[in-house]
């Protein structure tokens, strides 16, 4: 499971008790490996989730804390930076490391160098996750495997390539007959691909899959935009009937990223940077309008960035406000009791509180639907607060 550290699955920092409860329920419901990352690579924001996983592992023998480093480019992201982070991850008690290359920026020979250096810096297993957006992912995997990486993430061919991962079948065939042979049966893999191919075609037909994000865009290497961010940006522009501003926004993204301390572009920082770039382009003036998330990033609410933020932007967007310097969770008081009190009329299991914590409106709509199905009533005519239902 991909887990955003102190942000869990949401877009804001949550209290430690919410992090602890979510990890516990995730493992209780069958999750084994929890891939924990922070959008700023701020190690402090990962510790609580790692500790929570390890407590359960010590108590029940279940759970694997995998810390993911969000790979990105920039003069601050040196080889020394990555090896230092690997050592810190081992020291904090993680079980393994994932290099999360969400934008497909890790090119083959750099991958070889990175894997060799990180394997020398830590004894932890290293897993590599990349995307095909820039077109180099399969070659990157080949060089990474030769350099000693332990695991590579792939996708079945109907949903591979583009903003997804390299195709499983291609990598299996690549290593066939070598010391890296997976032993997987291509005939069985073909059956799996055949099962999913009609669904892929249906997604294309309905528009759920946009052909724009299924090919290779070499400009990814220029603008450093990850696949999920690219898909989100296309949707935002489409909603505003501004798809013709696509490349204007792509050019603005690196500028916004620089203003915000050059963070890796991964959820939620990718959405923050991407949405602000869209605003800057469509408003015709940079930071004329700033999202609440942009303001929180400038306030230090998400943690520490690898480089200082643009003071001129800070002065324009949040003039005179205090900048926070501690880990993101330090500013959020325990909230599980408060959240449970808010949604107590809908609670049927502990997991409901967590659903509400992360997605309050979506969860509430679901709880109402569930109640209607269970009681066979029309909730649009019911007074749920006072427990009055039409008959």
Regions found by a protein language model. Name each.
Residues 36, 97, 148, 171, ...:
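Conserved, mostly hydrophobic/aromatic
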Residues 139, 164, 172-175, 182-239:
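Core active-site phosphate/anionic-ligand binding loop and the adjoining beta-turn-alpha structural block
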Residues 1-2, 49-70, 111-128, 172-184:
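Alpha-helix-loop-beta-strand connector modules within alpha/beta enzyme cores
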Residues 77-89, 134-150:
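Catalytic cores of alpha/beta
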Residues 36-39, 101, 147-164:
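Glycine-rich phosphate-binding active-site loops on the catalytic face of alpha/beta enzymes
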Residues 210-220, 224-391:
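Terminal or standalone catalytic/regulatory effector modules within metabolic enzymes
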Residues 1-52, 56, 64-90, 107-108:
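Active-site beta->alpha loop and helix N-cap motifs at the rims of alpha/beta catalytic domains
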